[in-house]
Structures are given as structure tokens and as C-alpha cells.
Amino acid sequence: MPMDIETKQSGDLIFRSKLPDIYIPKHLPLHSYCFENLSEFNSRPCLIDGANDRIYTYAEVELTSRKVAVGLNKLGIQQKDTIMILLPNCPEFVFAFIGASYLGAISTMANPLFTPAEVVKQAKASSAKIVITQACFAGKVKDYAIENDLKVICVDSAPEGCVHFSELIQSDEHEIPDVKIQPDDVVALPYSSGTTGLPKGVMLTHKGLVTSVAQQVDGENANLYMHSDDVLMCVLPLFHIYSLNSVLLCALRVGAAILIMQKFDIAQFLELIPKHKVTIGPFVPPIVLAIAKSPLVHNYDLSSVRTVMSGAAPLGKELEDAVRAKFPNAKLGQGYGMTEAGPVLAMCLAFAKEPFDIKSGACGTVVRNAEMKIVDPDTGCSLPRNQPGEICIRGDQIMKGYLNDPEATARTIEKEGWLHTGDIGFIDDDDELFIVDRLKELIKYKGFQVAPAELEALLINHPDISDAAVVPMIDEQAGEVPVAFVVRSNGSTITEDEVKDFISKQVIFYKRIKRVFFVETVPKSPSGKILRKDLRARLAAGISN
């Protein structure tokens, strides 16, 4: 059954899910929604700490989160105040985030590997009143904390001037203040990656996150089918919205167990899957690539995994096929999201309770209770099937706006509620969405459009190439030409000419790579997106091969 296409008065062609709309309890605060069915799985595992195998039950997680809420309140945090969570994946991240939600407070999440300047910039921009971190990162905010009366809480050892997280947990959960949380109140403030400009605070509301989680896991035929016997691998950083939403919040809603890894290590990762019988693996392309290329995979039994989903960046067909062979019982597919969209716009219907057939390379179909359209970037007119254009989404799941930036908000969200993603894609005859590339990342060769993602998919399919990124280089005659940054596989001596020849045999003339630069690593954001602006900056500075 195809998505419904409605012709609006404006002439827009609007795409909707193959799945019927569902009731979503948008009046509930996020924590109430996540724990709505708590009595059904009180004693079941909620969090499993991969570092030490400690298990926290659902009852323990809910109780500890309420204690943390009281502890934060005693330190002065009130409704609509902001806390900063500067942590790698750990149970305390979960307690802090849910605890803040109970207070009607806001969590802004930051990468603990940020420089001190980056951390302070986000703390200042978000008006954070407390930072929750580890002792090894506390120094990054020390001076700013002293100057601005900012309290620093450490989850391990507490250096001088810091509060230990255990003090929060000692609070009496019955002393939680009575707050009236509105559906449109902000609960999470992630900062968008900044790959197309300066990082901006993305205001995600209780209603927005409840809607997004429900679009994935609620309903008789859930789009992303999960249940209380599932174990999700949480290796993606919780400070990124993909992991926070599609791993943590979705799992909490259905009563599944969440296996927490602080960071990705292929050997430990492969060891934990059979040890804890992991059933669902939410990954990003760099992890998928590591699995596909690792010789260690054959030493482990990965048969428990029934779902492998990839998001944050497009995954090529060849990489999909390579990983499919590693997980014998898993359905493999992609989702598509962006922070501003809450984040999920599309999800693979092979993951549904009653699955649909899908095509390799597609990144799903639009989620239910939402609308999608494809527009011409130049004219703004909506486009029919199979024509690439900018992807736009509308629904209760999208952000409220950018914090203190009404101009950027107005540029991103139209008055009619359409959020412009800046991504180029098309919807085919079977209602599946295909991402072509980022609008701003398209290379223009004499007016022809060259999509870096297409060339990258070809490059990493070469056995002597372990990773690659393609960016534009200014050219006097052509305007821009594609150049590649390539990471050689171990022991490889592949040359620039060999790489160029490999690509030229597979693409039209204007897509041929003009230069190849060999590098140790391709710079990427925590979510796995290639940091093209860093590579363009190296070109501008006159990189030498």
C-alpha cells in the first residue's frame, strides 16, 4: 500500500507513512511516558554496565532518577533551569537526564572530549547551572565554574570544589517538588553538529520526544519493533540525540535492557554481544565499516542479533551486503534523522513487527503521525516521486526552535511548520526514501552536481581502502572538482593513480576524482558524520600529499 499523497491547496505533494497514525499521549512528561508501563517490568534489567556487568533493574533506575531529581533541586536546580551532562556513556548519564526531566529542568549534553573552550562555550550559551562530569574532565570547566558560581558534580572521584554524584542519590525521593510540566516545555538541548555553521542549541520538548519515541516503538505494528526481552547495544554516545532517543528512550518505553559501552572497541564490542545476548544493534557507518572489515568477527557468535540499524550518515549498498553476511539472523536497514527533527524522520519498515520488504540503500519510509515533502531547492516547489530535492518534514516531533536564535529558526522552519533538512533525497515508487547528499555538500563541476557520498561508497569498497572522504576543491576552469582523502588499509601501498583509475572506471567524467590525499584518519563527528569543513580547511591551507 503506497503512502497517501494528498494535493494541498498550495499544490504540495505530501507523503505519509505506510503505517496508520496512532494515538500518542502527548500530554505526558517524557519521564512519565517512558515509565508508563513500569509495573510490567519493574524487576527486569534496565541498564547493564558493560565495564563491570552491573545490572540496574527498571525499579532501581526509576527510583534513582527521582532521588537525583531531589538532589539536583537541593543544589538549586528548579523548573526550566539547565544542567550540562558532560559524560561518556554510563548509568549516571541516564539518572541525570531522567532526574532533570522529573524537575521540569533541561539537559544540555556535550561531548566530554570537547576542548575546554568548546565546553565553556556551550555551558555559557545554554546558561547551565550545574555540570555533571567525570573527574578527568572537571578541569575543563574549573575556571568558568569558579567565575560563574557553577556547581560541578563528578560521578567518580570528586576533586576539590566538586560534589560527588553519590550525594544526589542519598536524597529522599519523596521530597521531589510538585511541578506542572507543559507539553511544549523544553527537556533536552542538544547542540547541532555545526557542520553547516556554528553549533546551535536545539530545543526539544517533552511533547516532541514523546512523539518521536512513539512514532518508532508504539502502536500495534510498531515501526521499530522492540519488546522487554530485547537487549540493545548502547555504544553510540548518549550525548548524541540518535542514541539518546532511539536507544535509551525507546528501550525505556518498551522495557528492554540497555547494554552500555563507554566507547567503541571492536574486540570488547564483539565479546559483549554473545555474553549478554544482544538482540538490537543501533550503529553508525564507521562502526558498520569496522564490523565489515574486522577479521575478529568470525571468532564470535553474533546469532542473537535480530536487528542492525544504521543512521547518522548514508550507508552504501556494498557495505550493507558485507555486514548482512556477519549477522546471520539480523534484519539490516537504515533510519534517517537530524537533531532538529527530534531526530527521526524515516525508519526502515523491515524493523516493523509485521515487516515490509525493503530495498538495499534506502533509509526507510517517513515515520507515522508526520508529513514529508521533497522540494526543489531553487524554487521551493514540491516534487513528485523519483525526483531528488530537499527533504522537508512536519509533525509534533520536530524542534521548538534554536535557543535564542529566532532568525536561524525562521530559516529552518517555515510558518506552515515545515522543517527544511538541508538534505537532498527522493522517494521512489515503493515509498522508500533515498538520501543523495547534503544540500550544502554537493560539488558543482561546471554546473553538474557531484554527490560526495556516492564516491565515498565506491572508494571504501576497494580492499586497499579502509575509509575515505570526498570534498570539493576550487578549480579555475570547473569551479569545483572532487578530491578524496583516503585511509589505506593495513599494509596497503595503493597509489594516487590507482585510486583515480579505480573510480574513473565506475563514474561519468565529471565525477572523476582529481586528487587523492592519503591520511591516517578521516575526521568525523561523534555521530559518524564526516567533518568536511575540516578537510576543506586543510585544502585551503595548502595540504601536501
Swiss-Prot record:
It is an enzyme of class 6 (ligase). The keyword 4Fe-4S does not apply. It catalyses: (E)-4-coumarate + ATP + CoA = (E)-4-coumaroyl-CoA + AMP + diphosphate; (E)-4-coumarate + ATP + H(+) = (E)-4-coumaroyl-AMP + diphosphate; (E)-4-coumaroyl-AMP + CoA = (E)-4-coumaroyl-CoA + AMP + H(+). Its EC number is 6.2.1.12. (E)-4-coumaroyl-AMP binds at Y242, S246, A312, Q334, G335, T339, M347, K440, K444. CoA binds at K263, K446, G447. Keywords: ATP-binding, Ligase, Magnesium, Nucleotide-binding, Phenylpropanoid metabolism. CDD domains: 4CL. ATP binds at S192, S193, G194, T195, T196, K200, Q334, G335, T339, D423, R438, K529. InterPro entries: AMP-bd_C, AMP-bd_C_sf, AMP-binding_CS, AMP-dep_synth/lig_dom, ANL_N_sf. Residues 265-334 are annotated as: SBD1. The keyword Ligase applies. Both substrate-binding domains (SBD1 and SBD2) are involved in the substrate recognition, and are sufficient to confer the substrate specificity. Carboxylate--CoA ligase that may use 4-coumarate as substrate. Follows a two-step reaction mechanism, wherein the carboxylate substrate first undergoes adenylation by ATP, followed by a thioesterification in the presence of CoA to yield the final CoA thioester. This is 4-coumarate--CoA ligase 2. It comes from Solanum tuberosum (Potato). The gene is 4CL2.
